[in-house]
């Protein structure tokens, strides 16, 4: 006679059932992060496609911005709300639109809709990488790396306009609209001379350089056990085993630079560190611009240029260009302010 002693299995609740369904092995993994990711990504992308196809920016910027009005892929945009809307969330049922969808689109409600759903969609994608990394049993460095573009998006599209007078000063969602925003950043903030922008450029271009060098080096050092192997004959794209030589790569770069990465972990961490840190730094810089913190100011050069008509530097030239951008862009970009600049206040070069 056998007596089995044990606990009765606990009754499965709705959480366990939902957890099983969300984590089921399927073609497109859903997961708990998918509850945030998929609806937000769908609504953000759908809102952008709807706005660029049908919705005008006439009421907010005095511009045509949709395919329906004759724009193309590079010139369509979902524009920011009017300056008079301040930092209102512009909810469809809010006091501005009062449930009128057409009025909501005219006021720029699609922009806040896309910006907020886009931000949460990106966060959901990062959480998806965390979740799958945990289930697969790998480290979460992909998710950590993806925090960099999220930081840039949030700082540029949300934090910067929150530091200014309204959502109006954020970028509109479109290619040409982003270019206009870059000119705005340069003219009003001298962004290219900001050290955080410099670190961002160094990170992005440095990351691209590292990727090119790394890919080329791996291709250069492919090998195959056996005789007569060359780089192009040695490798089968479907083979399982690793077939490149870290030792050979180390020897090559040691001869080129006199220094080389000694192991793969440090090499790949550096490739992660450079672009991610650059993007984080640029995001910090944009937060500074939201607070209207200034870039480098070389006052001594400005004073000397003002006193001496023959003294000019690239720095003082750029300041004149920035003044020109402001003088042109403020009346064009903010027609509601009714700016009028007399001839005598417009920028001139020292030689004039």
UniProtKB/Swiss-Prot annotation:
For this protein, the record's NCBIfam families field holds: psbD
Question: Which Cys-Cys disulphide bridges does the record give?
Answer: none
Domain of life assignment:
Bacteria
Q: Do you know which InterPro entries this protein is assigned to?
A: D1/D2 (IPR055266), Photo_II_D1/D2_sf (IPR036854), Photo_RC_L/M (IPR000484), Photo_RC_L/M_CS (IPR055265), PSII_PsbD/D2 (IPR005868)
Residue numbers binding pheophytin a: 129, 142
Q: Where exactly are the transmembrane stretches of this chain?
A: 32-53, 109-131, 141-160, 194-217, 266-288
Q: Does the keyword Transport apply?
A: yes
Q: Which ranges sit in the Lumenal compartment?
A: 54-108, 161-193, 289-352
What reaction gets catalysed by this protein?
A: 2 a plastoquinone + 4 hnu + 2 H2O = 2 a plastoquinol + O2
In its miscellaneous comment, the UniProt entry states: 2 of the reaction center chlorophylls (ChlD1 and ChlD2) are entirely coordinated by water.
| Its biological purpose | Photosystem II (PSII) is a light-driven water:plastoquinone oxidoreductase that uses light energy to abstract electrons from H(2)O, generating O(2) and a proton gradient subsequently used for ATP formation. It consists of a core antenna complex that captures photons, and an electron transfer chain that converts photonic excitation into a charge separation. The D1/D2 (PsbA/PsbD) reaction center heterodimer binds P680, the primary electron donor of PSII as well as several subsequent electron acceptors. D2 is needed for assembly of a stable PSII complex.
Q: Which Pfam families match?
A: Photo_RC
The record's family statement is: Belongs to the reaction center PufL/M/PsbA/D family.
Task: Give the binding site residues for Fe cation.
Answer: 214, 268
Q: What is its EC number?
A: 1.10.3.9
Q: Which UniProt keywords apply?
A: Chlorophyll, Chromophore, Electron transport, Iron, Magnesium, Membrane, Metal-binding, Oxidoreductase, Photosynthesis, Photosystem II, Thylakoid, Transmembrane, Transmembrane helix, Transport
Question: Quaternary arrangement and interactors, per the entry?
Answer: PSII is composed of 1 copy each of membrane proteins PsbA, PsbB, PsbC, PsbD, PsbE, PsbF, PsbH, PsbI, PsbJ, PsbK, PsbL, PsbM, PsbT, PsbX, PsbY, PsbZ, Psb30/Ycf12, peripheral proteins PsbO, CyanoQ (PsbQ), PsbU, PsbV and a large number of cofactors. It forms dimeric complexes. Part of a photosystem II (PSII) assembly intermediate complex PSII-I; crystallized from a strain deleted of psbJ, it forms monomeric PSII before addition of the oxygen evolving complex. PSII-I includes 3 assembly factors not found in mature PSII (Psb27, Psb28 and Psb34).
This chain belongs to the protein called Photosystem II D2 protein
What does the entry comment about cofactor binding?
Answer: The D1/D2 heterodimer binds P680, chlorophylls that are the primary electron donor of PSII, and subsequent electron acceptors. It shares a non-heme iron and each subunit binds pheophytin, quinone, additional chlorophylls, carotenoids and lipids. There is also a Cl(-1) ion associated with D1 and D2, which is required for oxygen evolution. PSII binds additional chlorophylls, carotenoids and specific lipids.
Any idea which positions bind chlorophyll a ChlzD2? 117
What Gene Ontology terms describe what this protein does at the molecular function level?
Answer: chlorophyll binding; electron transporter, transferring electrons within the cyclic electron transport pathway of photosynthesis activity; iron ion binding; oxygen evolving activity
Residues binding chlorophyll a PD2, per UniProt: 197
Q: Outline which residue ranges sit on the Cytoplasmic face.
A: 1-31, 132-140, 218-265
Pull one GO CC term from this UniProt entry.
plasma membrane-derived thylakoid membrane
């Amino acid at each position: 006679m056998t007596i089995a002693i044990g606990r009765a299995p606990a009754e499965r609740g709705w959480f366990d059932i939902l957890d099983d369904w969300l984590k089921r092995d399927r073609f497109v993994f859903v997961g708990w992060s998918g509850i945030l990711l998929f609806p937000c990504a769908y609504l953000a992308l759908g809102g952008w496609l709807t706005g660029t196809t049908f919705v005008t920016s006439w009421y907010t910027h005095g511009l045509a911005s949709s395919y329906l009005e004759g724009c193309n892929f590079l010139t369509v945009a979902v524009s920011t709300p009017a300056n008079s809307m301040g930092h209102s969330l512009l909810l469809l049922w809010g006091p501005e639109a009062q449930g009128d969808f057409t009025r909501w689109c005219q006021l720029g409600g699609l922009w806040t809709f896309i910006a907020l759903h886009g931000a949460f969609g990106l966060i959901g994608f990062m959480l998806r990488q965390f979740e799958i990394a945990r289930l697969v049993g790998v480290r979460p460095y992909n998710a950590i790396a993806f925090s960099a573009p999220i930081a840039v998006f949030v700082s540029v599209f949300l934090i910067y306009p929150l530091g200014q007078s309204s959502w109006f000063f954020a970028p509109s969602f479109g290619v040409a609209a982003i270019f206009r925003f870059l000119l705005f950043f340069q003219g009003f903030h001298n962004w290219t001379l900001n050290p955080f922008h410099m670190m961002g450029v160094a990170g992005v271009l440095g990351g691209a350089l590292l990727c090119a060098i790394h890919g080329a080096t791996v291709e250069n050092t492919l090998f195959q056990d056996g005789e007569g192997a060359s780089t192009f004959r040695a490798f089968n794209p479907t083979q399982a085993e690793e077939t490149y030589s870290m030792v050979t790569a180390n020897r090559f770069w040691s001869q080129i630079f006199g220094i080389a990465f000694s192991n793969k972990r440090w090499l790949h961490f550096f490739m992660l560190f450079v672009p991610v840190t650059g993007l984080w730094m640029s995001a910090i810089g944009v937060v500074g611009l939201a607070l209207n913190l200034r870039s480098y100011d070389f006052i001594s050069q400005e004073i000397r240029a003002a006193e001496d008509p023959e003294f000019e530097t690239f720095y003082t030239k750029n300041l004149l260009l920035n003044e020109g951008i402001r003088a042109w862009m403020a009346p064009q970009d903010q027609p509601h302010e009714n700016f009028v600049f007399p001839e005598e206040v417009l920028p001139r070069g020292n030689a004039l």
